[in-house]
Regions:
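Structural recognition of the beta-strand scaffold that forms the well-ordered cores
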Residues: 20, 76, 147-149, 189, ...
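Subtilisin-like serine protease catalytic core
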Residues: 136-167, 175-226, 241, 267, ...
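Extracellular S/T/G-rich loop segment that most often corresponds to the catalytic His/Ser-adjacent loop
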Residues: 151-153, 290-366, 370, 376-381, ...
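Autoinhibitory propeptides
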Residues: 4-14, 43-124
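N-terminal domain-start motif of subtilase-like serine proteases
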Residues: 2-12, 79-92, 112-149, 169-179, ...
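C-terminal subdomain of the subtilisin-like protease fold in secreted/lumenal serine endopeptidases
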Residues: 203-206, 232, 236-248, 255, ...
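Short glycine-/aliphatic-rich beta-strand segments at the starts of folded cytosolic domains
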Residues: 14-24
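Solvent-exposed loop/turn segments at secondary-structure junctions
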Residues: 104-108, 153-156, 171-172, 196-197, ...
Length: 401
């Protein structure tokens, strides 16, 4: 579980030792395999095309030196120092390889608890976040829209979701989908929780959306880029209109692999939404947008307090291409579901802002029929302007249609 007295938001970026290889859009499966097999030490190459959509999981990495995610056009390779030199040489001369980058450890983006604000309060009927985003006055519920939440899993025994159809898959080796952390259950609750919980106020946005849970972070709250890429491939293959990722690494330079994946997801009709990061220590240190949110093709979300000012931890935009904040949403003192027996919990972070936006995106997808880039633009067009710098909130506060 998360200890609210201990920050879990800002960690030096750690590398796993593996490499992410981004291929050109028009490269064939055969060209990708040939490029990888030309690398010294890469003898076996697995492909997501070799398994069913339901079977894509952590075991795909266990028997091969490299794995290709065909829909994403990305490979993950486990290479040593000698093979790395060979891989770099292959990338220099092979036109189907766009980039070779280190794989990073990613973490759930939750921060410390803060004193309650007074502008908007959780009421008897709904949370302050749903009030601020006008969800409570919206008649839509996201019915017919598939929303994928890639996080620490979900408490499948939670009584607020009894009878709800939930499609789930773990991408963490040795762990099932059941959430032993809490972060994922909280994010699923905010994005897709019930309209009328039996015992407490409403906390979920798209109460009628179809829930897809991809466990990409362990019960300790950490994972790898490979876990995320595998789950993104799974979500896109399952026709999810929205992917919500309340996770990241403090990497200021955009990762080419995520830029390509976000762009290819939009083309496939999937909007990817990610937490901007919690590395700010305002007012002195505004922080920066981390990966994967700092890709221009992934919607980056900043966090607001109940007085609709910036949450003190929420990262600010940076001058690098892709380092902008696109939109903002409630992220401080957010009440939502939590694994039993606790049932509910209040935590803070850009992680909590992100599922608000994901749920609202599902409402726009339902009301407009738009997908991909068109859905992105509809979501931005529906924002409420704020008297805050664009570097902090982008277009403004996400609001329901």
């Amino acid at each position: 579980m998360i200890d609210d007295d201990q920050p879990t938001s800002s960690h030096p970026a750690q590398q796993t030792g593996r490499r992410l290889i981004t291929f050109t859009d028009d490269s064939s499966h055969e060209e990708r395999v040939a490029a990888l097999q030309a690398v010294e030490g890469v003898d076996t190459v697995a492909s997501s095309a070799d398994v069913t959509t339901e079977s894509v999981g952590p075991e795909i990495f266990e028997t091969a030196d490299a794995t290709i995610f065909e829909r994403l056009g990305i490979a993950v390779a486990d290479v040593g120092p000698v093979a790395l030199e060979s891989l770099d040489a292959e990338a220099e001369q092979n036109p189907v390889i766009v980039a070779v980058e280190p794989e990073h450890v990613v973490r759930a983006l939750t921060t410390v608890a803060h004193a309650a604000h007074t502008h908007l309060r959780d009421g008897r009927l709904s949370t302050w976040g749903l009030q601020a985003t006008k969800v409570t006055t919206c008649p839509l519920d996201g019915s017919g829209i598939r929303v994928a939440v890639l996080d620490t899993g979900f408490d499948l025994t939670h009584p607020d979701f009894a009878g709800r159809a939930i499609v789930s898959r773990s991408f963490v080796a040795g762990e099932d989908v059941q959430d032993g952390h809490g972060h994922g259950t909280h994010c699923v609750g905010t994005s897709c929780g019930p309209k009328a919980p039996a015992t407490q106020c409403r906390y979920g946005v798209a109460s009628g959306a179809s829930i897809y849970v991809g466990k990409v972070l362990s019960n300790a709250g950490s994972g790898s880029d490979a876990n995320i890429l595998a789950a993104m491939e799974w979500a896109i293959a399952n026709g999810c209109a929205v992917i919500s990722m309340s996770l990241g690494a403090d990497v200021a330079t955009p990762v080419a692999a995520y830029e390509a994946v976000g762009r290819r997801a939009l083309a496939a009709g999937t909007l990817v939404i990610a937490a901007a990061g919690n590395n700010a220590r305002r007012p002195g240190d505004p922080g920066f947008v981390g990966s994967p949110a700092n890709s221009t093709s992934i919607l980056a979300v900043g966090a607001l307090a109940p007085d609709l000012r910036m949450a003190p931890f929420s990262a600010r935009a940076t001058p690098v291409d892709g380092g902008s904040i696109d939109i903002a949403a409630p992220g401080l003192d957010v009440y939502s579901s939590w694994p039993m027996p606790t049932r509910y919990h209040i935590i803070s972070g850009t992680s909590m802002a992100t599922p608000h936006v994901a749920g609202i995106a599902a409402l726009y997808a339902q009301s407009t029929g738009k997908r991909g880039r068109d859905l992105w633009e509809a979501l931005i067009a529906g924002t409420q302007g704020l008297a805050l710098p664009v570097e902090d909130v982008g277009a403004g506060l996400a609001t329901a249609p």
